[in-house]
């Protein structure tokens, strides 16, 4: 009986850990689409059911750590990219491991897109899809262990 209990407890623990990772909350490396180089580290948090993300580190070789978003057109214009909130107002879709309804900012060109986050590969990676009208682009971010 003790073996059955331990086996059931192990299965529940592993299942809970796997489910806990199917969330965008955590620390992620963004990857350059063209060079496959790690660009930055983004920390995604959740508060009151709303997900947001900030630039925690600029990791690209030669990145100016004091760079500001001069091309931004909202409240982030002229502000430091390091520490900047680039993901705003995403909410979980009922019954799915998908977060949407918010925006993502590309601080390199100041463009803002409708955002959709989907954890994949057991939560080890995150598909970040940015859309504007009929144009969309998906990046795959990698969870930092």
What kind of feature is each model-predicted range?
Residues 47, 120-122:
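Structural motif
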Residues 31-115:
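Central antiparallel beta-sheet cores of small beta-barrel/beta-sandwich binding domains
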């Amino acid at each position: 009986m003790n073996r059955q209990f331990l086996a059931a407890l192990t299965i529940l623990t592993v299942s809970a850990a796997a489910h806990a990772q199917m969330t965008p909350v955590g620390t992620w490396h963004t990857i350059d689409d063209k060079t496959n180089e790690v660009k930055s580290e983004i920390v995604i948090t959740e508060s009151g059911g709303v997900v947001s993300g900030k630039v925690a580190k600029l990791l690209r070789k030669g990145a100016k750590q004091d760079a500001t978003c001069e091309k931004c057109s909202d409240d982030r214009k002229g502000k430091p990219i390091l520490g900047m909130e680039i993901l705003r107002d995403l909410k979980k879709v009922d019954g799915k491991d998908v977060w949407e309804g918010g925006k993502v900012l590309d601080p390199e060109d100041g463009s803002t897109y409708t955002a959709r986050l989907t954890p994949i590969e057991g939560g080890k990676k995150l598909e970040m899809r940015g859309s504007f009208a009929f144009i969309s682009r998906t990046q795959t971010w990698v969870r930092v262990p």
